[in-house]
Amino acid sequence: MSKLVWLDAGHGGKDSGAAANGIKEKDIVLKIVKKVKSILTSRYEVAVKLTRDSDVFYELIDRARKANAAKADLFVSVHINATPGGKGFETYRYVKTSASSSTGQQQKVLHDAIYKRIKKYGIKDRGEKAADLSVLRNTSMPAVLTENLFIDNKDEAALLKKDSFLNDVAEGHAEGIAEILNLKKKSGGSAPKKEDKPSSGKTKMVIVKDNPDGFLWVYNKADWNARYKKVKPDEAFTIDKTVTVNGSKMYKLKSGLYITAASKYVTVKEK
């Protein structure tokens, strides 16, 4: 059964969102989500639904309810920023989810994929953030909100007026979503490899790094929801192999447990 992606173009109708330099947020984000949908449905085995595909208004709670009712696998809300003196790109997850959570790791995948596409324009990376935003709080699936430049910054508004730039923004969104959901490509394409054996004959150890939470979860199966126990910084475990789960890598340990393979949280050394 195909995965379902819910794309939410911010604002719409009576709510223009941010507006400056002759453009409105509601119009730009609608262009972006339509491009993302086109890329995803043309390249991957996936279903994509939009909160809106025209200039109409939906309350914030209704956006989340529609996605929840459809049982979407991933919710991505697309916005343009505005604040005096602001510039750059950032993403948000719900404030009560940590960077090391499943949602946090999926946020990182999406964030990195988008920034990889737009950094050639000299865009500032403002980082992965967390906030108590309605569409993130009320959705029942992993949800990420992207803020794609500042409409009130003259230079960034000039980019937002260029279709070529919006194409890159859309490509980044699509590539990140495809990686998160491990989407299978159409026309002979194949899904990413599920497992990779360690490259050398030496024993590899994964060591937990310091992080703001002061711990990491280990899991009793290859599932980000299968939390088993917390482990502390400097604890080390023997790696059996690497697996990909919903677009993010895990190490399967010799003990049979699993831990994130994200270099932000762990380091690997040969023994």
From Swiss-Prot:
Query: Keywords for this entry?
Result: Antimicrobial, Bacteriolytic enzyme, Cytolysis, Host cell lysis by virus, Host cytoplasm, Hydrolase, Viral release from host cell
**Signal peptide residue numbers:** none
According to its UniProt entry, this protein's organism is Bacillus phage SPP1 (Bacteriophage SPP1)
Q: Which CDD domains match?
A: MurNAc-LAA
Its subcellular locations are: Host cytoplasm
Hydrolase as a keyword of this entry, yes or no, is yes
GO CC annotations on file: host cell cytoplasm; viral procapsid
EC no. given is: 3.5.1.-
- Is the keyword Disulfide bond assigned to this protein? no
Gene3D superfamilies named among the record's database cross-references: Zn-dependent exopeptidases
Tell me, in a sentence or two, what this protein's role is. Answer: Endolysin that degrades host peptidoglycans and participates with the holin protein(s) in the sequential events which lead to the programmed host cell lysis releasing the mature viral particles. Once the holin(s) has permeabilized the host cell membrane, the endolysin can reach the periplasm and break down the peptidoglycan layer.
The processes (GO biological process) annotated in the record are:
defense response to bacterium; killing of cells of another organism; peptidoglycan catabolic process
Name the chain's protein: Endolysin
Q: Which InterPro entries match?
A: DUF5776, MurNAc-LAA_cat, N-acetylmuramoyl_amidase_3
Q: Per the database record, which ranges form the MurNAc-LAA domain?
A: 5-178
Report the GO molecular function annotations.
N-acetylmuramoyl-L-alanine amidase activity
